[in-house]
């Protein structure tokens, strides 16, 4: 089924997600020793990254002309993965200037699906796949299910030497996520 929607544009009436406390355990957590497939063909183990890393986590990117999952726009925090990714693309140089050594996106979609989005959106960084949910389960990340898919709720992390030092959750609106991270790093 195809529909006419532009994944880069957010509807005006999106419901805002509420802070349900589902990420409180993450600040100070050491990342698990799990390698994730990346869209650049590499395998990335976030627990072994040195320096400062930023990871933004999102449910799933849509594709122009493809139907959204059932009730997608009514799920608080679901819509906006493409604008969030574009925001991090547009703030990539700012993040580097502020000392971020690595930037990644992360979702449960396949690497092939993510690669198409990374190329279409001209992302200057890799997207990581947790398709098997091993990373998600190891960290007890908040998820939701729709149309048979288990998806991670939207958030962003600042990581220093494999330890999560700051969590942005909930993230809303998603197109301001990168700006929020830049502002926090600038403070």
Residue positions per predicted region:
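Chalcogenol-based redox active-site neighborhoods
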Residues: 1-187
């Amino acid at each position: 089924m195809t529909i006419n929607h532009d994944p880069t544009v957010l509807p005006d009436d999106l419901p805002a997600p509420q802070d349900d406390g589902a990420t409180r355990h993450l600040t100070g957590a050491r990342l698990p020793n799990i390698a994730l497939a990346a869209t650049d063909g590499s395998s990335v183990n976030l627990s072994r990254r040195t320096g400062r890393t930023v990871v933004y986590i999102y449910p799933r990117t849509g594709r122009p002309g493809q139907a959204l999952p059932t009730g997608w726009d009514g799920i608080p925090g679901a819509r906006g993965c493409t604008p969030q990714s574009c925001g991090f693309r547009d703030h990539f140089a700012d993040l580097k200037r502020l000392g971020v050594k690595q930037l990644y996106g992360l979702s449960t979609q396949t690497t092939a699906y993510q690669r198409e989005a990374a190329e279409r959106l001209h992302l200057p960084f890799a997207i990581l796949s947790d398709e098997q949910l091993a990373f998600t389960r190891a960290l007890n990340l908040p998820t939701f299910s729709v149309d048979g898919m288990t998806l991670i709720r939207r958030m962003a992390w600042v990581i220093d030497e494999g330890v999560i030092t700051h969590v942005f959750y909930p993230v809303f609106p998603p197109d301001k996520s990168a700006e929020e991270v830049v502002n926090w790093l600038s403070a």
